């Protein structure tokens, strides 16, 4: 069992990574929001089960959570315990941060992607129309409990997809971690306990350091967490991919853009694509002309856009990055880099 703490505007969050975590130790007056099909780790607490997946990040689902909290007589001394994947954790963060202007929140991520991404950061959101995370809040949890036991039964494709986010942390923030990942792909794909704990712990430590430095995205530092996500989010919507698969494509495209702009050496583009492929993640995708146009069109709705420009985090070498102001059309063209040899289907 490994743990650390990070500080923020609401105080301190405890992060625990290990197996067999005693959940009741970390919550007071719990009410549970849980993904359908999962076993409630706090069976004596009131619970609402919702279907997981991106569809849960809706105003309709948010309304159901508010009704549940009201019927459970939750107040500002209650703790909403969110048990599930990243989409459900996003919804829970939004609900906890807005119900009665804020109640307690504990995150229990049950997928690898949720552990290394959605659980930490304090972002809660719902989708609006075709745009991901358009309506949201910043609201930090009291604790994040990453029990690796949840990952034993995770479907292989879902499990593998999370490594796009893990690679992102090493690629953009920590060259030594990036090198460790290149040496540890087999152990991680085999769900080796020690390697998995190390990957989750180090990913969270890196993300926490960024959140501490720029909790509300006011200084530009937190933009590094969006490496691969500008192109990735557009492709996720158009192709219906898992989030991690789309981020993998986004990383490949944005690295190519960085190289074309003269920031990144070609060897790192190919080296990182090889690492993503080692985790059985895509770096190319066939798109029809209509899909390509749709993906490009979605770039203009990206939250990093300011008028005619997108502020894009670009990796310049493993562990180093810059924030570059690029025209929307220039970033949109980067979508083409994931199409094999620039051809559309």
Swiss-Prot record:
Question: What are the GO MF terms of this UniProt record?
Answer: 3-dehydroquinate synthase activity; metal ion binding; nucleotide binding
Membership in a protein family:
Belongs to the sugar phosphate cyclases superfamily. Dehydroquinate synthase family.
Q: What is the protein's name according to its record?
A: 3-dehydroquinate synthase
Tell me which domain of life the UniProt entry assigns to the organism this sequence originates from: Archaea
List UniProt keywords, sorted A-Z. Amino-acid biosynthesis, Aromatic amino acid biosynthesis, Cobalt, Cytoplasm, Lyase, Metal-binding, NAD, Nucleotide-binding, Zinc
User: Function of this protein?
Assistant: Catalyzes the conversion of 3-deoxy-D-arabino-heptulosonate 7-phosphate (DAHP) to dehydroquinate (DHQ).
Q: Its Gene Ontology biological processes?
A: amino acid biosynthetic process; aromatic amino acid family biosynthetic process; chorismate biosynthetic process
Q: What is this protein's gene name?
A: aroB
Under Enzyme Commission nomenclature, its number is 4.2.3.4
What is the predominant subcellular site recorded for this chain? cytoplasm
UniProt-listed Pfam families: DHQ_synthase (PF01761), DHQS_C (PF24621)
**Which cysteine residues pair off into disulfide bonds?**
none
List of residues binding NAD(+): 86-90, 110-111, 123, 132
Work out whether the entry's keyword set contains Zinc.
yes
Which compartments is it annotated to reside in?
Cytoplasm
Instruction: Please give the coiled-coil regions recorded for this protein.
Output: none
Cofactor(s) required for function per UniProt: NAD(+); Co(2+); Zn(2+)
- If you read the UniProt record, what top EC class would you report for this enzyme, in one word? lyase
Binding residues for Zn(2+) = 165, 229, 243
Q: Does the keyword Transit peptide apply?
A: no
């Amino acid at each position: 069992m490994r743990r650390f703490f990070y500080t923020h505007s609401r105080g301190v969050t405890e992060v625990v990574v290990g197996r067999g975590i005693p959940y009741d130790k970390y919550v007071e007056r719990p009410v549970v929001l849980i993904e359908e099909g999962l076993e409630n780790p706090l069976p004596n607490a009131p619970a609402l089960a919702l279907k997981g997946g991106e569809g849960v990040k809706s105003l309709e689902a948010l309304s159901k959570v508010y009704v549940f909290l009201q019927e459970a007589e939750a107040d500002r001394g209650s703790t909403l315990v969110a048990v599930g994947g990243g989409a459900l954790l996003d919804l829970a963060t939004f609900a906890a941060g807005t119900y009665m202007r804020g109640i307690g929140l504990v995150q229990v991520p049950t997928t690898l992607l949720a552990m290394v991404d959605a659980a930490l950061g304090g972002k809660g959101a719902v989708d609006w129309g075709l745009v991901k995370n358009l309506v949201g809040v910043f609201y930090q949890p009291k604790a994040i409990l990453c029990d690796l036991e949840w990952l034993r039964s995770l479907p292989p494709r879902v499990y593998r997809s999370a490594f796009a986010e893990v690679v992102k942390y090493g690629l953009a923030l920590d060259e030594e971690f990036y090198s460790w990942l290149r040496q540890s792909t087999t152990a991680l794909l085999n769900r080796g306990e020690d390697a998995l704990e190390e990957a989750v712990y180090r990913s969270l430590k890196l993300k926490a350091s960024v959140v501490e430095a720029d909790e509300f995205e006011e200084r530009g530092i937190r933009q590094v967490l969006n490496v691969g996500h500008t192109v990735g989010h557009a492709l996720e919507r158009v192709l219906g991919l898992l989030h991690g698969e789309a981020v993998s494509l986004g990383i490949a495209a944005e690295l190519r853009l960085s190289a074309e702009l003269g920031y990144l050496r070609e060897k790192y583009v190919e080296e990182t694509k090889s690492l993503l492929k080692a985790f059985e993640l895509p770096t190319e995708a066939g798109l029809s002309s209509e899909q390509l146009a749709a993906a490009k069109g979605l770039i203009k709705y990206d939250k990093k856009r300011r008028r005619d420009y997108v502020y894009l985090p670009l990796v310049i070498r493993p562990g180093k990055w810059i924030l570059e102001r690029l025209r929307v059309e220039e970033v949109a063209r980067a979508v083409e880099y994931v199409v094999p040899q620039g051809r559309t289907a």
